From Swiss-Prot:
Keywords: Amino-acid biosynthesis, Aromatic amino acid biosynthesis, Decarboxylase, Lyase, Tryptophan biosynthesis
GO biological process, one term: L-tryptophan biosynthetic process
Pathway membership, UniProt: Amino-acid biosynthesis; L-tryptophan biosynthesis; L-tryptophan from chorismate: step 4/5
GN (gene name): trpC
Protein family according to the UniProt entry: Belongs to the TrpC family.
Single GO molecular function: phosphoribosylanthranilate isomerase activity
PANTHER family: INDOLE-3-GLYCEROL-PHOSPHATE SYNTHASE, TRYPTOPHAN BIOSYNTHESIS PROTEIN
Name of this protein: Indole-3-glycerol phosphate synthase
Reactions the enzyme catalyzes: 1-(2-carboxyphenylamino)-1-deoxy-D-ribulose 5-phosphate + H(+) = (1S,2R)-1-C-(indol-3-yl)glycerol 3-phosphate + CO2 + H2O
This protein's record includes keyword Amino-acid biosynthesis: yes
InterPro entries attached to this UniProt entry: Aldolase_TIM, Indole-3-glycerol_P_synth, Indole-3-glycerol_P_synth_dom, Indole-3-GlycerolPSynthase_CS, RibuloseP-bd_barrel
Naturally occurring in which organism (per UniProt): Acidovorax sp. (strain JS42)
Enzyme Commission designation: 4.1.1.48
Amino acid sequence: MSDILKKICDVKVEEVAAAQKRVSFTDMRRDAESRVLTRDFVGALRAKIDQGQAGVIAEIKKASPSKGVIREDFIPADIAQSYAEGDGKVGAACLSVLTDRQFFQGQPDYLKQARASCPLPVLRKDFMIDPYQIYESRAFGADCVLLIAACLEDGLMAEMEQIARSLDMAVLVEVHDGAELERALRLQTPLVGINNRNLRTFEVSLQTTLDLKKEVPADRLLVAESGILAPVDVHTLRDAGVNAFLVGEAFMRAPDPGRALAQLFA
């Protein structure tokens, strides 16, 4: 685990402990299980791909540890609507909302605001290190959760996936190298995210996705993450057979995020 990732995960341990003092595990589980039906995250991606379009998970992110504040004019509901509409022809399949406070200046309310403003399924983008967070995610309204292989041992990762499935949530499992991919493929989820950013050095290379794609079975849906900034990046990946993408920074820096999405994936 990289230094920054370890630092983030250590903070998460403290955050989960504090959260459980406010709302017990039992109460959070009860809240999660009482929530209304989820939106079909995987189905939304596949529907776009079946139409010949890219399946885009458009991210709502105010800041990051490596770039600082990315978007000053940050209104999650407006951004979500912009993503859903695109240019009227090309729009997002799903949303990803950062809820981490300390490192990404996110918060759970951003997820709630985004989901309430449009019909798209929503991924809670955070660093999951405890089963409590899976129940918490459903209570917040998430339709999908992120499990980062580098943060989790196999047994815990499988347990957290099973909890998510029991709540009818999708799981996006994220990897960066072959060893992590091998572990991720033991899970049942069809969604496999390949992060092109090295969390140790923060260097980004699309070659990471191109290399690892060869090891991803055809029944899994590969999602390319990070470093997708220009049409040439999209063309490179699509030519290699990649059809799903998680993109944030390129849109967050644009005046109209939805139009930027449509232009990137035209």
